[in-house]
Amino acid sequence: MKKIWLIVLAVTGLLILTVAGFVVRDGATVTPVGEGTITLEAGTFEAFPLPQFAAKHISEDYKSYFVEVEPGIKVHVLEVGSGFPVFVQHGNPTSGFLYRKVAEELPKDRVRLIMPTMVGLGFSSKVPASSHTVANHMRWINTVLNQLQLSELVYSGQDWGGPVGMGALSLSPGLIKGAVMLNTGFGAPTRAANLSIPHAVVKIPLLGELLLEVFFPIFDGMGRLQGDPDQYTADVAELYGKPVVDSGNAKAPLAMMRMVPDGPDHPSSPAMRAVANYVESLDIPAEIVWGMRDPILALGLPGMKRFFPDAPVTETQGGHFLQEEVPAEIAVALLRVVDQVQASRGDSQ
């Protein structure tokens, strides 16, 4: 009998190790495939017809296409409008669709809104968890901007879209002419510190995978980060979550949470410090629009003011994904900055 129990325990242990190994696997590269092409001033790109569950959220005048930033790694880009380029960068775990309501508030004849989706999220390529680094994401988004042959732009970013967007621009420092900063942050902690309790918990190996990928999928809980949780509907959860889950590689949300530096020696810290130094060097028209009901980054407003001490600040009742809740306030700020940029060069319309 004792021998039987030992065999049972051994088999059980082997099964547990097998399951654990599967859960914490690095994940594979998943390359999406488009259909046809789309021609822009910068050249011809691979078109990506949107599935109905996503297409229903935007108007028919949007362009949807891929920019291949490395062999097998494609960034999905949405854009709408014509006029002065405005590059907007989302963060974790959303996609370029996060700015769709902002787009509705902007005059399409004055602004060309460019909305890339970070690798690993939305309809962009999925990559192994180990490939999610600040430096990689900066380089990938910078490659998008370069392939679109942009010579100037106004920028806005939120969550990881702050460091990644500004980081991408730091690699082509002449591009940015103005900015509207949303809930995000720059730099790295000078001592051990976690951004939030969830960030501290999910960085624990295996526990993070079990929590975010098995028991409590991150896309189902995003409403808790909003000023009005009821605005985060099942349709919106599907918009952000379905492309990631259906791809077979849903590693990005957890990997991006683990990218957040928790001290000066974190792997992300050198890149984050470099981005902060770049932001400090900027002398551009800027505004800040902040969601004061953001449970993660609301308290980061004073820090953002230090980077842009002369920027007008609009405090809102939005939560973490404030683009979903206060798009009009963001759009108005973007237009004011675009007007300032154009006026400064003498071509205000």
Question: Predicted segments — roles?
Answer:
Residues G319-A331:
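Catalytic histidine-centered segment of alpha/beta-hydrolase-like enzymes
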